[in-house]
Amino acid sequence: MTESTFPQYPRLILSKGREKSLLRRHPWVFSGAVSRLEGKANLGETIDIVDHQGKWLARGAWSPASQIRARVWTFDKAESIDIAFFTRRLRQAQQWRDWLAKKDGLDSYRLIAGESDGLPGVTIDRFGHFLVLQLLSAGAEYQRAALISALQTCYPDCAIYDRSDVAVRKKEGMALTQGPVTGELPPALLPIEEYGMKLLVDIQGGHKTGYYLDQRDSRLATRRYVENQRVLNCFSYTGGFAVSALMGGCRQVVSVDTSQDALDIARQNVELNQLDLSKAEFVRDDVFKLLRAYREHGEKFDVIIMDPPKFVENKSQLMGACRGYKDINMLAIQLLNPGGILLTFSCSGLMTSDLFQKIIADAAIDAGRDVQFIEQFRQAADHPVIATYPEGLYLKGFACRVM
């Protein structure tokens, strides 16, 4: 397609000097950078982004009610946003996942990781022959039909299920959606394989898209720390860390979560892998309260896994989140035997690795214990981070030896 045959997109004109982030290929335009919109654009519609002199910078999606006024689809002026565009992006992403799946023997992985795969607001996880779709931005929702058409072209044998039932959609004025898009309905629990483990995934009712694929490598790493150890698995969800700990030869693993449904699946996962169920305990409780109760009763563990949900959604919550992370890690440190291992994580994108490390250090000081950092974790390689979008590195973790 020649430039003269392109659709005439509305133009988002930036204020003078506010083009620097786009020149560095960052995919977001914030409200404070916007001078005006020239032409009319509906929510999520494609727009051209230009500097104050009219020089073309990028092509993106318009979101007038969001702090992020535009999310960039492409920095290539010759690229239109259509089915062919999404097909190219999908095939480019699949090349990397094919290599990973073959190398690690995976049947489930993140196929599209939003901005880092050039599709802002789009998350797609693959579980066997099911593609689970989350559209998290107005632009992604506006392009729903084109994206689904591209998915059907690239994956004709896969069923597509929509899990766009996340609260973040409300920030851009979108309703929550969930249900089958094409093909069969996922079973209530779908078995997948991960580094020798068989795990049941609840696509329809589970957290996010059903399972935390981003912690795959951290679950595997757990095995080298747990042989003959007593393990406490906090915020256990469906027991991926617990199964991995049992496969690593732990003496006992106690899994704690507030959801009985998740704990029931965790128990099934232990049984599915034919592991010793007598070594696994499942406790429905609030982790903060239980850790304090354990401290009062003198309970001790050799390894503690701390994988809490996101504590911070925006900058205004960061201080409170820091206190939460500090308190819970302090409690964990107090419960560890000398020489014990704390595997602790944060999935909050606003929490940098440096800040998280400082929080753990402060928690150790408050606990009156010395801590050595011995290993660092991040999201699995099917969740890549593009260099121009450091916000994509949201999951970070540390293995700490507590003296």
UniProtKB/Swiss-Prot annotation:
Extent of the signal sequence: none
Function field: Specifically methylates the cytosine at position 1962 (m5C1962) of 23S rRNA.
Source taxon at top rank: Bacteria
Subcellular localization(s) per the UniProt record: Cytoplasm
Predominant place of localization: cytoplasm
Keywords: Cytoplasm, Methyltransferase, RNA-binding, rRNA processing, S-adenosyl-L-methionine, Transferase
Protein EC: 2.1.1.191
Catalytic activity of the protein: cytidine(1962) in 23S rRNA + S-adenosyl-L-methionine = 5-methylcytidine(1962) in 23S rRNA + S-adenosyl-L-homocysteine + H(+)
Membrane-spanning parts: none
PUA domain: residues covered: 9-88
PANTHER family listed in its UniProt record: RIBOSOMAL RNA LARGE SUBUNIT METHYLTRANSFERASE, S-ADENOSYLMETHIONINE-DEPENDENT METHYLTRANSFERASE DOMAIN-CONTAINING PROTEIN
One GO term describing the cellular component: cytoplasm
Entry keyword Cell membrane: no
Gene3D superfamilies linked to this entry: PUA domain (2.30.130.10), RNA methyltransferase domain (HRMD) like (3.30.750.80), Vaccinia Virus protein VP39 (3.40.50.150)
Pfam families per UniProt: Methyltrans_SAM (PF10672), PUA_3 (PF17785)
Family: Belongs to the methyltransferase superfamily. RlmI family.
Name of this protein: Ribosomal RNA large subunit methyltransferase I
GO molecular function: RNA binding; rRNA (cytosine) methyltransferase activity
